[in-house]
Structure formats: C-alpha cells, structure tokens
Regions:
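Binuclear metal-dependent phosphoesterase catalytic core
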Residues: 1-46
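Extracytoplasmic/lumenal domain signature
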Residues: 39-71, 76-152, 156-193, 197-225
Length: 225
C-alpha cells in the first residue's frame, strides 16, 4: 500500500473526507452536509474504553501508570529501568517490576522520538531543537546539543555513539559521553523521524524526501542513496 494521510476539511456547511498519498494530489472520497441532526436519538452509547477483550483472553495488568500527556515513543530498557518520553516534554524512568517512577527530566517541548541508553546515559531528542544526554540513574542532565530544528527522530546508540536525525534535515553522530558532535550529514531534503539502522559500517535511514540513505558510520560521508 501507499503511505499517506486522512484529511478532514470542515467548512460552515459540510465535512469533506480526503486521502493525501505522499507525492500525489489530494483525493476527496466522501462529503457530509452539516445540516439537521447527524445522530440517532434512540442509539445506545458505546462504553469507552472497552475492556471486554481482557476477559476473553485472561489478560491481567501487572501495573499501570497514568502519565501527564500522550506517549508517542516506544520505551527503552536498561537493567531494571525503562525510559519513555511524552507529549509534555518529560522523560520518565520507571522500575520495570512495579511501575514505580524513579525520576523525571523535563525538556522544553514534546518528546516524540524513541530514546536509547548505553553505559548509564539516556539520549533523546525534543521538539525544542535539542538532543539531550541524561544520567540513567537519576535523570540529571549530562550534556545537551542544540540543533536548527525540532528533533523528532529516534536514537540508535552503538559503541558509545548516538545516531539521530532531526527536522533540520540532518543526520548526526554524537559522542554519548561528551555530547560533542562527531559528524553531521546535511544532504537530506526532508524530515528524519525514523530510528537509523547501523550495520556493516553504515548508517541507513529514510526521510520524508522519499529517499533511503546509507552513510559511512565513521565519518558521515554518503555511500549511496
């Protein structure tokens, strides 16, 4: 299938539903007038959320923690701790066994991309145009690196080097101990939001410019695209 988005155009008298595939014109496939009543008075409201499927399969909750905002990123595990960012810009560490909050670090804006940790340092990006390195033990900031655009990409750490893309159309390699940039590649013409693959001496990633890139992991030079 093709990658794209659903778009709802709301006007004073109607709602139009469109599909926008990447690289193609927007296509309208449904429209509804905003006149009269668009609901059934006799209909029974659905209970939400519906947990009945848990009874069917015997699922039991080990622990559940209510956050302060939407969680769009995947958690990352190091030892008995897991780390996850949220829409309020907070990176939180939890005890995996019981869900107890261990510490919390606040960035200036939302955290969308997946974090990663190695050797006691958690690395993640934020929409405040910053890449952070914080202690996995207590959440204290060790370093930060400013960028020229929101950092919504996921992090990959290999042998003390963090690879992360950003919305300034750059892929970066950062020393996780010092926060210093080892190299950056600026040949991208679209946002980078994925977690790069590091294999066979290459950093491989895709971007919103419909392109897959392979860079030399040691110096960031382009191998192919």
């Amino acid at each position: 299938g093709k990658n794209g988005y659903g778009i709802y155009d709301v006007t004073e008298d109607s709602i139009k539903v469109c599909t926008q595939n990447i690289g193609e014109p927007k296509k309208e496939w449904a429209a509804f007038p905003l006149k009269g009543e668009l609901f059934d008075h006799n209909a029974k409201a659905n209970e939400y959320p519906d947990y009945s499927v848990n009874k069917q399969y015997g699922v039991k909750v080990k622990w559940c923690v209510k956050g302060e905002g939407g969680i769009y990123s995947s958690p990352f595990k190091e030892d008995n701790r897991l780390f996850v960012g949220d829409d309020t810009g907070k990176l939180t560490a939890y005890n995996i066994k019981n869900g107890k909050r261990l510490w919390q670090f606040s960035a200036q804006r939302r955290i969308v991309g997946d974090c990663a940790a190695e050797n006691g340092i958690v690395v993640f990006g934020s929409a405040d145009s910053t890449v952070y390195g914080v202690s996995s033990a207590n959440g204290k900031m060790i370093w930060k690196l400013k960028t020229q655009g929101p950092v919504l990409g996921a992090v990959r750490i290999v042998n003390g080097l963090a690879y992360i893309g950003a919305s300034d159309n750059k892929m970066r390699c950062i020393d996780t101990k010092t926060g210093k940039e080892v190299w950056e590649y600026s040949g991208v013409t679209g946002y980078i939001v994925t977690r790069p693959l590091v294999t066979d001496g290459k950093v491989i990633f895709g971007a919103w410019d419909n392109t897959l890139y392979a860079l030399d992991a040691s110096n960031g030079s382009e191998v192919w695209k």
